[in-house]
């Protein structure tokens, strides 16, 4: 049995040896390649070739090598470096890395890098050391240091190990910032110490610069510290105001207000308070203030001092000097503002007081002061009636009203004439050509009138305005006739009467202001008295009106005679048209004034002072027989010659007991010179091209001929043709060119390019035309030749 068992052991050993013994057969490289190729073709084997194709490796083995590289690099391996080290295509490495990260939760694939938990724990320790050293750290700093995404660092590193490896806490206001409790305590200590040492308002930025604490931490810890002060805001220019400073400010303001009952804004601003009004309201919530531009007055100062004094002033019918009851450092502007504010209150009556230079007068005091001036007003009214000044004023006003109505009719006639001219041009189809056929259209202008402005007034004197009488060119101005107000009482007279009473009170410096205050009232009283006296003396008024109209008619007849000399220099056809225009304008005025005078003498009521031919004929038929035939003949003469009209006018004047002044030819030259000067002044003020050419033509005609001319704008071409021989060729060419441009502007659309270009050329030539008209003399004709 023993030998059998030994045999069995031997056989077993042989068998085991046979099993353990391998039979190796060496294959050639070619055979190996063929075997692997065959396995690959039958998909029995998967390999990964190296970049040079000389080697290959199985994916599992490559995965182990990648993990080895991760371990060898300390837990963080860049896949690009791994690909270069293993000599394998990067796409294969990336695919296996993704599989490793997916299968192993302890490995992360971040931005082409494999990172394991060991590396994360390592950088968590570094972060903890840095946080302990600096006290505060942000994710952005860590991302820059470790070259890792901020989200990965915050979620998988810091927040994951916060409270474990990383000893710190997260900022509640900014989750990307972490700090240690010791750091917070240090910041609190710095802030508390800095704020405790401040005794005046300091900029927060300066404080942070000194203690080296971030602004966000400062504001977050400020409430926890509860400092003895307050921060104005969380903006960049915020200031810290310590309570001791605010208390000092409040004590000063309270003390000043208690002593003076008012506060100056400038004084409060000097304490470092920017909004003084808001501070006053906050400091004195139960007090009422009168807020002015520079100061704030307390209610007790206003009510107990100023209002009480004003009530006493009104009751005693005296005056009050506000500078004696208000603080001395208030300016006159402040005092006036105080008075205005008090008068604006509901319980005040502004009509009871008059404020002048810090002095408040009660109305009864001033009424008594100017009482003597009413007697002066009555005396001046009687003197105006006795001297005829008031009657002359009434006449001038009446004539001005008539002239304005006549001006309106002439303006309407001018518009009709222009429409007729446009229709004629449209039917003929001609736009001009040659100096003979040109017409210049101008605005309707004021008829010729020469008389000095006389003082006048009646019960409606407040409606009167400045009168500017002038010898205008025919059609040379479009302003309505107005009358200068009549001042019967002068400021100096009022001052003289009240000055004695004011000197006793030391208020003589206010005499001009008081006089100006009552001047209009006294003038109204004087004019009312004058009207009363005027109505009580109708016969005197009739004589004054008679004389005024007689002078006016004589003035107009002289004008017609002077204008007749000028128009006789033209051809027969042009002369006929000028005569018609002259009688239509000035002749019509003479007829109107005489008709209205006769109507007044016959006690006829005339509603409209601007009469046409039919109205005058109807009025003449209603008049007394002594006037009727003369007035009817005068109306007919308007369509005849100038001589016929003058004869008819003489008949009317004779019937009205008026005389015609003798002709004084010595004054003709002065009248012509005065007429020319006024034309030149109008030319300097004129900017409209058509009117400017019209005025220039009239001035040149007067200079060359020595005569004046009453002509509308349609006669400009005839005037230029008449003076052509007295001007040089360049001067004629310039006037002709200017005339053509005016026609072009009038005949084209205002917004067209041609019109704009013509306007520009007219502006360029305007100064030359004005200079020619202003400086041309008869001597210049010989010089030009």
Swiss-Prot record:
GO biological process terms, semicolon-separated: protein K69-linked ufmylation; regulation of proteasomal ubiquitin-dependent protein catabolic process; response to endoplasmic reticulum stress
Similarity comment text for this entry: Belongs to the UFL1 family.
MF terms (GO), sorted A to Z: UFM1 ligase activity
Upper taxonomic lineage: Eukaryota, Metazoa, Ecdysozoa, Arthropoda, Hexapoda
EC number of this enzyme: 2.3.2.-
GO cellular component, one term: endoplasmic reticulum membrane
Name of the protein described by the UniProt record: E3 UFM1-protein ligase 1 homolog
General function of this protein: E3 UFM1-protein ligase that mediates ufmylation of target proteins.
UniProt-annotated stretches for the region Disordered: 404-482
Annotated PANTHER family: E3 UFM1-PROTEIN LIGASE 1
Annotated source species: Drosophila persimilis (Fruit fly)
Keywords, comma-separated and alphabetical: Transferase, Ubl conjugation pathway
């Amino acid at each position: 049995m023993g030998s059998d068992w030994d045999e069995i052991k031997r056989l077993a050993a042989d068998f085991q040896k046979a099993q353990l013994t391998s039979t190796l057969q060496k294959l050639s490289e070619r055979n190996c390649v063929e075997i692997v190729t065959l396995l690959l073709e039958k998909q029995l084997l998967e390999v990964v070739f190296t970049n040079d194709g000389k080697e290959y490796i199985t994916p599992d083995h490559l995965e182990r090598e990648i993990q080895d590289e991760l371990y060898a690099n300390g837990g963080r391996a860049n896949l690009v470096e791994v690909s270069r080290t293993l000599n394998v295509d990067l796409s294969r490495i990336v695919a296996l890395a993704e599989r490793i990260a997916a299968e192993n939760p302890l490995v992360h694939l971040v931005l082409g890098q494999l990172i394991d938990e060991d590396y994360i724990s390592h950088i968590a320790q570094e972060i903890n050391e840095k946080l302990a050293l600096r006290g505060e750290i942000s994710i952005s700093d860590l991302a820059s240091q470790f070259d890792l995404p901020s989200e990965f660092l915050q979620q998988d590193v810091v927040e994951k190990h916060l409270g474990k490896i990383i000893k710190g806490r997260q900022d509640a206001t900014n989750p990307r910032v972490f700090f240690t409790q010791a750091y917070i305590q240090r910041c609190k200590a710095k802030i508390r110490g800095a704020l405790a040492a401040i005794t005046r308002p300091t900029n927060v930025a300066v404080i942070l610069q000194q203690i080296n604490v971030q602004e966000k931490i400062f504001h977050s810890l400020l409430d926890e510290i509860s400092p003895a002060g307050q921060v104005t805001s969380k903006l960049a220019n915020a200031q810290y105001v310590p309570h001791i400073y605010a208390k000092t400010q409040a004590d000063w303001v309270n003390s000043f207000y208690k002593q003076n009952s008012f506060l100056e804004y400038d004084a409060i601003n000097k304490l470092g308070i920017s909004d003084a009004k808001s501070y006053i309201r906050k400091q004195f919530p139960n007090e009422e203030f009168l807020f002015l531009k520079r100061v704030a007055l307390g209610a007790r100062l206003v009510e107990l001092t100023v209002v009480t004094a004003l009530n006493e002033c009104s009751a005693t019918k005296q005056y009050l000097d506000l500078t004696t009851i208000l603080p001395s450092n208030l300016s006159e502007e402040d005092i006036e503002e105080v008075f205005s504010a008090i008068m604006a209150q509901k319980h005040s009556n502004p009509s009871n007081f008059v404020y002048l230079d810090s002095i408040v007068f009660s109305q009864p005091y001033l009424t008594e002061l100017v009482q003597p001036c009413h007697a002066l007003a009555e005396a001046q009214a009687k003197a105006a009636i006795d001297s005829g000044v008031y009657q002359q004023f009434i006449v001038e006003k009446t004539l001005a009203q008539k002239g304005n109505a006549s001006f309106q009719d002439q303006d309407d006639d001018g518009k009709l004439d222009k429409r007729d001219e446009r229709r004629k041009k449209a039917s003929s189809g001609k736009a001009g050509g040659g100096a003979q056929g040109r017409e210049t259209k101008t605005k309707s202008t004021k008829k010729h009138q020469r008389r000095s402005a006389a003082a006048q007034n009646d019960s409606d004197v407040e409606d009167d305005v400045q009168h500017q009488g002038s010898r205008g060119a025919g059609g040379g101005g479009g302003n309505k006739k107005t009358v200068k107000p009549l001042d019967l009482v002068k400021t100096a007279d009022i001052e003289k009467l009240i000055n004695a009473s004011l000197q006793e009170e030391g208020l003589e410096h206010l005499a001009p202001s008081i006089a100006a205050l009552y001047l209009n009232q006294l003038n109204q009283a004087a004019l009312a008295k004058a009207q009363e006296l005027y109505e009580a003396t109708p016969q005197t008024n009739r004589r004054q009106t008679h004389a005024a109209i007689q002078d006016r008619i004589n003035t107009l007849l002289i004008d017609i005679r002077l204008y007749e000399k000028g128009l006789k220099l033209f051809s027969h056809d042009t002369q006929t048209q000028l005569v018609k225009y002259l009688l239509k304008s000035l002749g019509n005025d003479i007829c109107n004034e005489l008709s209205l005078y006769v109507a007044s003498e016959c006690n006829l009521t005339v509603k409209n002072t601007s009469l046409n031919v039919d109205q005058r004929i109807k009025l003449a038929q209603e008049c007394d027989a002594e006037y009727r035939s003369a007035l009817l003949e005068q109306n007919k003469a308007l369509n005849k010659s100038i001589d016929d009209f003058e004869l008819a006018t003489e008949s009317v004047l004779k019937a009205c007991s008026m005389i015609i002044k003798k002709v004084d030819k010595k004054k003709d030259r002065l009248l012509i010179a005065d007429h020319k000067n006024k034309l030149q002044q109008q030319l300097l003020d004129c900017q409209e091209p058509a009117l400017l050419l019209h005025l220039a033509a009239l001035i040149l005609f007067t200079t060359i001929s020595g005569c004046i001319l009453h002509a509308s704008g349609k006669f400009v071409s005839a005037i230029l043709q008449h003076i052509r021989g007295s001007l040089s060729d360049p001067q004629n060419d310039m006037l002709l060119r200017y005339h053509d441009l005016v026609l072009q502007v009038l005949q084209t659309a205002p917004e067209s390019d041609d019109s704009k270009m013509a306007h520009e050329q007219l502006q360029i030539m305007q100064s030359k035309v004005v200079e020619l008209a202003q400086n041309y003399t008869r001597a210049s004709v010989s010089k030009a030749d």
